[in-house]
Structures are given as C-alpha cells and as structure tokens.
Amino acid sequence: MQQYLDLMKHILAEGVDKSDRTGTGTRSVFGYQMRFDLSKGFPLVTTKKCHMRSIIHELLWFLKGETNIAYLRENKVSIWDEWADDNGDLGPVYGAQWRSWPTQSGDAIDQISQVIAQIKAQPDSRRLIVSAWNVGELDKMALAPCHAFFQFYVADGKLSCQLYQRSCDVFLGLPFNIASYALLTMMVAQQCDLALGDFVWTGGDTHLYSNHMEQTVLQLSREPKPLPLMTILRKPESIFDYQFEDFELTNYNPHPHIKAPVAV
C-alpha cells in the first residue's frame, strides 16, 4: 500500500491548512487518485493494523439498507456511535440511498439491485452508477455522505470500480473506505461472474486532521508489508445474502495499531 503512504507524504508536503466543520483543523489537498489492481492482493493497509471485522460488518449493514446502528452494536462495531441519536438512528444515510432512493411518485429505487442487473444485461453501459448524494435528503442525515458516488466498468471480462469521495479523513477513514469498496467490487464481480479488475479511488477534499500528524509521521516510518488475500468462501444467491462468515482474510501481518481521535 505504498500508494497510501505516498498520499500522506503529498498532503504533508503540498497541502494547505484549512478550518473544517469539526473545528479540529486539517492539512488538505484537492483532487487525488489511486489505483489498486485487485488481482494482486487485497488493498488493506499494512503499516498499521486495520479492523477488517468492522469493515465487513459495516458493508453488510449498508447492503441491508439499514440506517439504525443496532446491527452494528450487536456485532461490536462502534464506528457510527458518535453520529447516532438516542435511538440509534442516523437518518437516510448510505443504506437508505443504496437500497431505497425515494422517487417523486412515492416509490423507491434499489440502486444495488439495479446496477447488478445492468452489469449483467449491459456490461458496456456508462450508467453503472450508485449515488448516496441525495441533495433532497442531506439535511435529514446525521452525516452527509463522504464516499458519495461510485461507478462500475466492465472490460475484458473484468469488473472495475471507481469511487468519488468528496471528503476524506486520510489517517482514520481512508483505509476503511478502500477496503470496503474493494470488497464490494469482489462481491459484485462474483455475482456477475466476472474477474477482478481495478479499484480506483478519487478524492475531493483529501485531508489529514491536525491531531493526526504525530500518528501520520509514525506510520510513514514503517515499511509496507505484502498485501493480504481476501477469499469469498461461497457464492450466495444474491448480493444481499452474504454473511460475515463468508469472508476469509489471510496473510495479513500488519504493523501494530495506531490510536487516533475521531473528529466529530
């Protein structure tokens, strides 16, 4: 994951200091892209230990269309706790937009089912897109979507995915985002009987928080290790039938975890 370390170096060297919604302060660049060949290993950061269990459960939670953190809490995942209300609700965040985007007629669009059907029927379509950025519902969300928009691309029997992330917490959030969308691409590829292509990550406001600088320097002092392997152990009937036990991560030997505060 040298690409990830190179991004950190780029922000430290070329970034500008900015204020932000949380009041923490950031060093930021605008517009950055990384590409990961998914056939060459699973892109999970190795210069610190990442909690893959949380990443998998969060993705399954998105795919369920849920917006209450009860499922996450049941599985000891706390990454959304700071934003939930007293009942555990987050408003119409990712899961709602992915699975039930509201229409003017009062119906809802299941974007995940729709895009998989499109990939199977029209793999050369340039409309293989899922969006979480629903302008009409942003004010109802506990947190506006950071990873806002993704597009699939099929060529030579391989499935690739590009994510546009409008706002990116590089130290804490980005390793989760890369791994999550890489895994989603693997799942969709399996459902569509396609081989793996690339995961392309594109960032808008791409930043390091001012209280993550010491941790960033520590991480940059570490040498990346070989990428792990992610295996999907079975092919369920649909994208919505995967269980946590269907995923096996092997050969992951990261450097120790680095603790850092979350900017809320």
UniProtKB/Swiss-Prot annotation:
Cross-referenced CDD domains: TS_Pyrimidine_HMase (cd00351)
Query: What pathway does the annotation place this protein in?
Result: Pyrimidine metabolism; dTTP biosynthesis
EC main group: transferase
Cited PROSITE patterns: THYMIDYLATE_SYNTHASE (PS00091)
Matching entries from InterPro entries are given as: Thymidate_synth/dCMP_Mease, Thymidate_synth/dCMP_Mease_dom, Thymidate_synth/dCMP_Mease_sf, Thymidylate_synthase, Thymidylate_synthase_AS
Q: Please provide, alphabetically and separated by semicolons, the GO molecular function terms listed in this UniProt record.
A: thymidylate synthase activity
GO BP, one example?
methylation
According to UniProt, the reaction catalysed is:
dUMP + (6R)-5,10-methylene-5,6,7,8-tetrahydrofolate = 7,8-dihydrofolate + dTMP
Q: Name one GO cellular component term.
A: cytosol
Q: Where does dUMP bind?
A: 21, 126-127, 166-169, 177, 207-209
Please list the coiled coil stretches: none
Q: Where is the active site?
A: 146
Q: What Pfam families does the record tag this protein with?
A: Thymidylat_synt
Q: What is its EC number?
A: 2.1.1.45
Q: Where in the cell is it found?
A: Cytoplasm
Tell me which UniProt keywords the record has, alphabetically.
Cytoplasm, Methyltransferase, Nucleotide biosynthesis, Transferase
Q: Which residues bind (6R)-5,10-methylene-5,6,7,8-tetrahydrofolate?
A: 51, 169, 263
Function, please? Catalyzes the reductive methylation of 2'-deoxyuridine-5'-monophosphate (dUMP) to 2'-deoxythymidine-5'-monophosphate (dTMP) while utilizing 5,10-methylenetetrahydrofolate (mTHF) as the methyl donor and reductant in the reaction, yielding dihydrofolate (DHF) as a by-product. This enzymatic reaction provides an intracellular de novo source of dTMP, an essential precursor for DNA biosynthesis.
Task: Give the family, as the similarity comment puts it.
Answer: Belongs to the thymidylate synthase family. Bacterial-type ThyA subfamily.
This protein's assembly is summarised as: Homodimer.
Can you name this protein?
Answer: Thymidylate synthase
Q: Which organism is it from?
A: Shewanella sp. (strain W3-18-1)
